[in-house]
């Protein structure tokens, strides 16, 4: 009896599962239709009968809707690719126009920059012309400066000799003006340079040379006699200082030389 009851329960369960399996596909038609995109065709939406096939059916419907649009997309892409060189050319033209406007705006500065070497060359030529004009205007001073160039070199090498030579310059000019009168002293310089230098060192103390060259030459003629009578340089210097006050030495040097008593009384 119990076995019969158990078999009856099993049959009721199987019938209930079969009824449920036949109902679910019929109830799932409305949700599936609501999930499909609106741009799909009715034929595509009607084929969706099983929920398991829903993703695959949706993918096929999307592909079927996109494929008719693909030729237009390819045509637009090819047109864009063909227009790329024109875009590059247009960009280059814009850059060239901007550069041209910049050059036109700074044309003055650009021209000045290009003319800088010419300006420097012109300035150098002007300086050279000014120097040449200065040399031509002061040709005498320039030649005199060139003549003194050896003395300047001597001053750089030996300052003492340069100072001694500078002290002798006035008398050298006087000797050039009166070469015959200075001939004995030139011979003395050739024979005894030390005595000549001592004699020339005493000459600046005589103011008579600047006042009267003739009297100075007479005084120079008397120097050899003083070199014999006054071997001391200090004594000779004192005699040189007394010469302007002795009028006899200027008028008659021979008579003045015959008066050694004056020298003995003074020194």
UniProtKB/Swiss-Prot annotation:
The keyword Signal applies. Transmembrane segments: none annotated. Keywords: Repeat, Seed storage protein, Signal, Storage protein. The keyword Zinc-finger does not apply. Residues 1-21 form the signal peptide. GO terms for molecular function: nutrient reservoir activity. It holds the Pfam family Zein. It comes from the Eukaryota. The alpha zeins of 19 kDa and 22 kDa account for 70% of the total zein fraction. They are encoded by a large multigene family. Zeins are major seed storage proteins. Belongs to the zein family. PANTHER family: ZEIN-ALPHA PMS2 (PTHR48214:SF1). This is Zein-alpha Z4.
């Amino acid at each position: 009896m119990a076995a019969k009851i158990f078999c009856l329960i099993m049959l009721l369960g199987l019938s209930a599962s079969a009824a449920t399996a036949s109902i679910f596909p019929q109830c799932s038609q409305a949700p599936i239709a609501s999930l499909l995109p609106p741009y799909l065709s009715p034929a595509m939406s009607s084929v969706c009968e099983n929920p398991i096939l829903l993703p695959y059916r949706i993918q096929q419907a999307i592909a079927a809707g996109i494929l008719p649009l693909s030729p237009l997309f390819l045509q637009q892409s090819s047109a864009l690719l063909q227009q790329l060189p024109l875009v590059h050319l247009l960009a280059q033209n814009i850059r060239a126009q901007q550069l041209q406007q910049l050059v036109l705006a700074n044309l003055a500065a650009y021209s000045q920059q290009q003319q800088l070497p010419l300006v420097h060359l012109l300035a150098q030529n002007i300086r050279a012309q000014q120097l040449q004009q200065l040399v031509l205007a002061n040709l005498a001073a320039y030649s005199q400066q060139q003549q003194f160039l050896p003395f300047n070199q001597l001053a750089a090498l030996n300052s003492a000799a340069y100072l001694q030579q500078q002290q002798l310059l006035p008398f050298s000019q006087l000797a050039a003006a009166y070469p015959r009168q200075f001939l004995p002293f030139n011979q003395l310089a050739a024979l005894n340079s030390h005595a000549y230098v001592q004699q020339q060192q005493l000459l600046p103390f005589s103011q008579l040379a600047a006042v009267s060259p003739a009297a100075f030459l007479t005084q120079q003629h008397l120097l050899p006699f003083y070199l014999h009578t006054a071997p001391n340089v200090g004594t000779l210097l004192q005699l040189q200082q007394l010469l302007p006050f002795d009028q006899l030495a200027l008028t008659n040097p021979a008579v003045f030389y015959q008066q050694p008593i004056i020298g003995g009384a003074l020194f």
